[in-house]
Amino acid sequence: QDLPGTDNSTATLCLGHHAVPNGTIVKTITDDQIEVTNATELVQSSSTGKICNNPHKILDGIDCTLIDALLGDPHCDVFQDETWDLFVERSNAFSNCYPYDVPDYASLRSLVASSGTLEFITEGFTWTGVTQNGGSNACKRGPANGFFSRLNWLTKSGSTYPVLNVTMPNNDNSDKLYIWGVHHPSTNQEQTNLYVQASGRVTVSTKRSQQTMIPNAGSRPWVRGLSSRISIYWTIVKPGDILVINSNGNLIAPRGYFKMRTGKSSIMRSDAPIGTCSSECITPNGSIPNDKPFQNVNKITYGACPKYVKQNTLKLATGMRNVPEKQTRGLFGAIAGFIENGWEGMIDGWYGFRHQNSEGTGQAADLKSTQAAIDLINGKVNRVIEKTNEKFHQIEKEFSEVEGRIQDLEKYVEDTKIDLWSYNADVLVALENQHTIDLTDSEMNKLFEKTRRQLRENAEDMGNGCFKIYHKCDNACIESIRNGTYDHDIYRDEALNNRFQIKGVELKSGYKDWILWISFAISCFLLCVVLLGFIMWACQRGNIRCNICI
């Protein structure tokens, strides 16, 4: 189908942008649902299902907790002197030694996890007048009774348990972590059988701190055949400080110290398998890519991870506003420029031209405006990632039962942070999408105005994104318009002449239409006058009688 008003002496040039049959809905500041040609998902909503062992060093706890590995539970001896970036605790981990409790379990666990090492240095403590290396059938090491390898259970020697007073200075340049404990017998009889005194006492001091613990004899729930317990405590000795241990019974003594390191190591509870792969970000669900700025896989993360948000999806527009082409038009059909809809047939650029002239029809992309839009949009995802990625990890928070109110407050703070970031993410993406759509619309308008300035009075803006060119414009002429080398002065006289001729025809055609309408109106008027005159004449002659009743 030819373009209206197109013959060999004129041409039609339309400007437009590409479109797709099915676009993607995104959100902007002004519109919750606007269709664009292309968009990128910004929320990572799934994991790989496994924890990648690269680039972070992962230590699989298997069936040991970190504290059991620290104390030296016999079934955790494989972890002696190990190091890690992330220690993974499993849900099936269990203790298999003397029953114990750690009054400040969460703090000790976090402290050791962040240190990233179980490197242990044995020291020569001198324990005079007592029996060392106590063991229990609840803590088998092979067929023999055993105990925690990093602790030394001291009991009476013969019938005496003297007062112990031992010192150990820290002459190193790093902090030392000492683990020690207090034994709580199940009965008073057990107390005197092991330590002679009816009540023991343990005091551990440094220049900065002092801890004094009194054992509590009494029966407790049976665990691995025992109703007695050990309470585990810890002390950090700074460089130049000194450790002092004083006791008259019930002491579970240290055998040495753990080296303390500073770093960003951590611990995570997860049952995801460890696989051979590479990922910077780890969650309890498994590793996730960090090529997106947001994720809703898990709140707990380790490494350089996307920010956790509540949304399942946030789409960033990376294409222009999509206005699908009306399929009934054909290539040109009834003229269609960018004002009406996009062009689905244009695949080699975002913006372009369609023309019809004496040589036929054609289409070409405008690469300059296309590249300008692409350059401005490229890097949007990376810029959003830079604004939102956490270069640190979100650790698990643990609190004892007596710290329930602190735990509630911590949960409230974390939930508030998530709500805030979810809102920020929504606004950030909406702003970026608005900017993208405005930007791509602007490039289309720039191209249209550039073409208008070239053609000047040689063409007429048809109001729909097309120009009617009033001179013969072959393919070379069309190409000059596209590449900006068109000289309107060359065609000015021809265009002016053709414009008057075409407008004159349109004017005569317009007068004819007016005459027809006026003739029709006069004929109707005369018919009404004749009919009215006949009725009045008939009434006067008596042929028609008209009665009016009130």
Curated annotation (Swiss-Prot):
Residues 536-550 are cytoplasmic. Disulfide bonds join C14-C466, C52-C277, C64-C76, C97-C139, C281-C305, C473-C477. The keyword Transmembrane helix applies. Glycans are attached at N8, N22, N38, N165, N285, N483. One of its GO terms (cellular component) is host cell plasma membrane. It is a single-pass type I membrane protein. Palmitoylated. In natural infection, inactive HA is matured into HA1 and HA2 outside the cell by one or more trypsin-like, arginine-specific endoprotease secreted by the bronchial epithelial cells. One identified protease that may be involved in this process is secreted in lungs by club cells. Major glycoprotein, comprises over 80% of the envelope proteins present in virus particle. Homotrimer of disulfide-linked HA1-HA2. Belongs to the influenza viruses hemagglutinin family. Binds to sialic acid-containing receptors on the cell surface, bringing about the attachment of the virus particle to the cell. This attachment induces virion internalization either through clathrin-dependent endocytosis or through clathrin- and caveolin-independent pathway. Plays a major role in the determination of host range restriction and virulence. Class I viral fusion protein. Responsible for penetration of the virus into the cell cytoplasm by mediating the fusion of the membrane of the endocytosed virus particle with the endosomal membrane. This is Hemagglutinin.
